[in-house]
C-alpha cells in the first residue's frame, strides 16, 4: 500500500473539510443573500413574466423546502389586444408551487380571475394557449378551494368552489380541463370545462365545452354571458346540459347546446317581448340540439333548433291562438270559436309542443302530451283538446307574422324594427325571404 506522509494526510483532511463543510455553507450563504436581497423579487417577476408572456407583480417569495416555492400577493396582467395598456387577468393571495419531473402543481388561495368581457376573456385564454408551446413543462395542475370569476359586469360575477384543473402542454393540441362547483344559492352542481386548441387543423381550431355533471340544475344566469336570461326566461329559470363553442382561425364563435331549460316563465318569454300576445305558466324546454353560427346570405344566428316545450296550468291569449292558426296553420278546436267574444284569454291544463326549426326556415311541429292524447295535440284544458299542430310544415316567416302582426305595422312595412323585433334577424329563413326581410327591417 502506498504510504501517505503526514503533510499529505493533512492536506486531504483540509480539502475534505473545505469541500464538505465550508463550501456548502458558503453556497447556502450566497443563496440566502441572493434570495433575500432587495432586487430578488424583481428578478423573479421578470423571469415569470418572460415565461408566461405577462406582467407579473409579487409581494413576497418564500422557499419552504427544495422544489417548493410560495408566491404571496401575485398579480398577472396582460396587454390589451389593441395595445392600449395592461389589464389584470388574475390575482391570488398565495400560490404554492411544487415542481416535479416536467410537471408543476399549483395550490392557490384567494384566487380571482378577471376579464373586461366574456369575449375578451376568451381572447386572453387563447393568447396563453398560443404561448403554451414555450413552456418547459408537460403538465400543470391547479387546485383552489375558492375562486371568484369577474367578467366585467355586475351580473357576470360568479363564485366558484372546489376548483381542480390540469393543463396538458401538447405542442399540437394544448388542452385545459377544469372541474369545479358553482357556489350559487341553492346549488352545488359539479361542472366541467374543457378548452383546447387544435394546431394541426387548417385553420387552427379552438373549442370550449361547458357541461353540468351532477347535482341540481344551475341558475340560468350562468348564461348571462350570452344573453340577459332574466329578461328572457324569468328570474327563477334554471339550466342543465352541455354547451360547446368552437372557433376556426380568427372567426366568430359557433355554439351548440343540448340540455334543459327549467322553470321558464312564459309570461316573460312571450308577454314581455311580444306585447300583442299573452301566455302565462311555467315551462320546461328540453333542447335536443340548438346550433348558432354563421349563415350564408345572413348574419350570425340560429341555424337549427330541435326540442320539446311542455307546461302545465297556464293561460294563453285568444289573439295568440288565432294568429297561430292564421299564420302557422295550427288547428283550433271548435270550442275556441264558441268563446265569449269578450274573453281575451283561455286557461289550459297542459301544453306540449315538439319543434324542429331547420336551416331552410321550415318548422316541423307536433304534439308532446304523451299517450293520453293524439300525437298532434298541443294544448288541452281540463276536459278536452284546444289546439292541434299543423298538418304540414310551418315556417319562420309565419312565426314572424304571428309574433309581429302585419296589421299593426305602418303601410309598406313588413315588420317594424324595434329592440323586440331585432331577434328576427337571428332566425333562419329562406334566402328570398331573408332578402325581403332585410330590406324591410333596414328601411325603418
Q: What is each residue range found by the language model?
A:
Residues 131-138, 159, 170-175, 180:
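Extended, helix-rich scaffolding/adaptor regions
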Residues 441-444:
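Short, solvent-exposed mixed-charge patches
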Residues 148-171, 302, 321, 328-330:
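Short, solvent-exposed loop/hinge segments that bridge or flank secondary-structure elements
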Residues 62-147:
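Flexible beta-edge/linker motif
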Residues 1-51:
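N-terminal type II signal-anchor transmembrane helix
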Residues 100-104, 118-121, 150-158, 295-301:
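Short acidic, Gly/Pro-enriched loop/turn segments at secondary-structure junctions
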Residues 50-59:
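A short, amphipathic edge element
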Residues 68, 73-75, 110-114, 141, ...:
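Small-residue helix/turn framework positions
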Amino acid at each position: 500500500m502506498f504510504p501517505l506522509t503526514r503533510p499529505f494526510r493533512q492536506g486531504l483532511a483540509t480539502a475534505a473539510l473545505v469541500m464538505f463543510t465550508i463550501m456548502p455553507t458558503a453556497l447556502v450563504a450566497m443563496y440566502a443573500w441572493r434570495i433575500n436581497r432587495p432586487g430578488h423579487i424583481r428578478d423573479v417577476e421578470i423571469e415569470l413574466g418572460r415565461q408566461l408572456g405577462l406582467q407579473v407583480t409579487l409581494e413576497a417569495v418564500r422557499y419552504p423546502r427544495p422544489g417548493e416555492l410560495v408566491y404571496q400577493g401575485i398579480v398577472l396582467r396582460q396587454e390589451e389586444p389593441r395595445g392600449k395598456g395592461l389589464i389584470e387577468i388574475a390575482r391570488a393571495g398565495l400560490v404554492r408551487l411544487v415542481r416535479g419531473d416536467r410537471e408543476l402543481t399549483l395550490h392557490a388561495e384567494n384566487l380571482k380571475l378577471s376579464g373586461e368581457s366574456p369575449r375578451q376573456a376568451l381572447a386572453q385564454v387563447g393568447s396563453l394557449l398560443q404561448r403554451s408551446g414555450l413552456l418547459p413543462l408537460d403538465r400543470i395542475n391547479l387546485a383552489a378551494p375558492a375562486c371568484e370569476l369577474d367578467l366585467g359586469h355586475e351580473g357576470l360575477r360568479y363564485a366558484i368552489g372546489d376548483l381542480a384543473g390540469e393543463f396538458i402542454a401538447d405542442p399540437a393540441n394544448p388542452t385545459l380541463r377544469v372541474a369545479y362547483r358553482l357556489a350559487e344559492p341553492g346549488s352545488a352542481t359539479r361542472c366541467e370545462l374543457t378548452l383546447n386548441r387544435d394546431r394541426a387543423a387548417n385553420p387552427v381550431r379552438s373549442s370550449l365545452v361547458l357541461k353540468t355533471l351532477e347535482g341540481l340544475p344551475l341558475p340560468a344566469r350562468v348564461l348571462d354571458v350570452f344573453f340577459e336570461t332574466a329578461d328572457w326566461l324569468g328570474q327563477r329559470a334554471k339550466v342543465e346540459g352541455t354547451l360547446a363553442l368552437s372557433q376556426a382561425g380568427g372567426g366568430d364563435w359557433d355554439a351548440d347546446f343540448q340540455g334543459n331549460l327549467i322553470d321558464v316563465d312564459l309570461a316573460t318569454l312571450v308577454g314581455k317581448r311580444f306585447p300583442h300576445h299573452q301566455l302565462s305558466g311555467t315551462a320546461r324546454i328540453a333542447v335536443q340540439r340548438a346550433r348558432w353560427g354563421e349563415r350564408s346570405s345572413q348574419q350570425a344566428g340560429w341555424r337549427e333548433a330541435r326540442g320539446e316545450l311542455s307546461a302545465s296550468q297556464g293561460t294563453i291569449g285568444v289573439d295568440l291562438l288565432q294568429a297561430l292558426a292564421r299564420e302557422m296553420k295550427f288547428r283550433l278546436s271548435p270550442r275556441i270559436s264558441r268563446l265569449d267574444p269578450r274573453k281575451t284569454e283561455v286557461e289550459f291544463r297542459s301544453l306540449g309542443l315538439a319543434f324542429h326549426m331547420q336551416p331552410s326556415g321550415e318548422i316541423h311541429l307536433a304534439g308532446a302530451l304523451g299517450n293520453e292524447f293524439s300525437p298532434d295535440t298541443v294544448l288541452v284544458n281540463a276536459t278536452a283538446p284546444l289546439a292541434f299542430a299543423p298538418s304540414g310544415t310551418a315556417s319562420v316567416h309565419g312565426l314572424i307574422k304571428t309574433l309581429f302582426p302585419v296589421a299593426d305595422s305602418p303601410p309598406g312595412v313588413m315588420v317594424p324594427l324595434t329592440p323586440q323585433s331585432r331577434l328576427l334577424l337571428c332566425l333562419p329563413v329562406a334566402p328570398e325571404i331573408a332578402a325581403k326581410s332585410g330590406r324591410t327591417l333596414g328601411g325603418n
